[in-house]
Curated annotation (Swiss-Prot):
It holds the Pfam family AP_endonuc_2. Binds 2 magnesium ions per subunit. This is Xylose isomerase. Its cofactor is Mg(2+). Involved in D-xylose catabolism. Mg(2+) 2 binds at residues 270, 273, 309, 311. The active site is at residues 103, 106. It comes from Lactiplantibacillus pentosus. Gene3D superfamilies: Divalent-metal-dependent TIM barrel enzymes. One of its GO terms (biological process) is D-xylose metabolic process.
Amino acid sequence: MTNEYWQGVDQIKYIGHQDKKSGLGFQYYNPDEVIGGKKMRDWLRFSVAYWHTFDQRLVDPFGDGTAQRPYDHITDPMDLALAKVDAAFEFYHKLGVDYLCFHDRDLAPEGDTLRETNRNLDKVIDKIVDYQKQTGMKVLWNTSNMFTNPRFVAGAATSPDADVFAYAAAQLKHSLEIGKRVGAENYVFWGGREGYESLWNTNMKLEQEHAAKFFHMAKDYANEIGFDAQMLLEPKPKEPSTHQYDFDAATTIAFMKEYDLDKDFKLNLEGNHANLAGHTYQHEIRVAREANLLGSLDANQGDKLIGWDIDEFPSDLYEATAAMYEVVENGSIGPRGGLNFDAKPRRSSFAANDLFYGHIVGIDTFAAGLRVALKMKQDGFLEKLVADRYSSYQSGVGAEIEAGTADFKSLESYAIDKPQSELIAATSSDPLEEVKDTINHYIIETLSK
């Protein structure tokens, strides 16, 4: 690197509980500290999202972009694309993360044809690969942007226009080749326009069949070229589509099983997407892990007062603790998963160094959540709580139900003469208020040490 883009920022270190007024530093994330049998960096595998960090201009539906970035003076599109790579790898080094994620169109400008676009992209990938050799920086996942360009107005794999499907397949082919070049550990499919605006003019069955064919083609080509990445589908219920086909984890799992994709694909789950679907982040992770389909996580949060996808940096300790408890229960985020910060500063946080503060709060939030989740797991607090709640299935009629020896006739004989008073007396109170109070206590106590 010839220029220092992020001036005034040194490499960010773990400072523990020093006064945060001392500047940039991690209070809870100590990357090489071993907790729960693994280094924190291996539990969390943090990644920086190229699009939000280096391309995002902080626009919103009511105003122009406010972002001030150290490469804004560069006007030539290819010169700017190459300069962003320098700025990005300086950022990764100073932040101390091990992974990055990107869309193909984050990196280089499009040409008039796909051939020209691929040529531009390859020049940037050459530079990224050189930096990888120098730094050891890895790619958690890459993906293809098939939602921004007007050609994808009605979707890519689900477009009613066969030419658009063909173009999307050709674009994805090159994206998979790039994934192999950079050693991406996963490949993500997020279909923002793979859905519909109105059912009146939509053949929903046909569109979903086309999407499944597209995913099978992608996996087949990855196998053909030796690109051994975990394939991931990312659910989202809406926006920009009125209704997106991969609405949430459960819907996407059903789709995967319907079209025989569940052997090769897992899920990449995002906090804000979970909220838009009417779920907690923990719910979505639980659904995926219990189906053995948890692949990776996008770390961000929504705003309860705002009904759209705002991709805010995560700062909710309670939600992060719940998410990391599911990860601890799973043993890892996924076979090759990590925590990618699909997050951006607020429009009013436009200074370049706000990008560091945003990532620091996100990193510390999930590191804190991991510490609390491991402490709860170590104490067996939730395991005992759940075991006690379902203890009636350990003996008597409950054991018969579990063993599969009970049927409606035997259960009728057991229940038909039981008085209501006996049933009510056998029902235990769920002390949810006590549970939440205890979780608050774990958060406060664990993070105070």
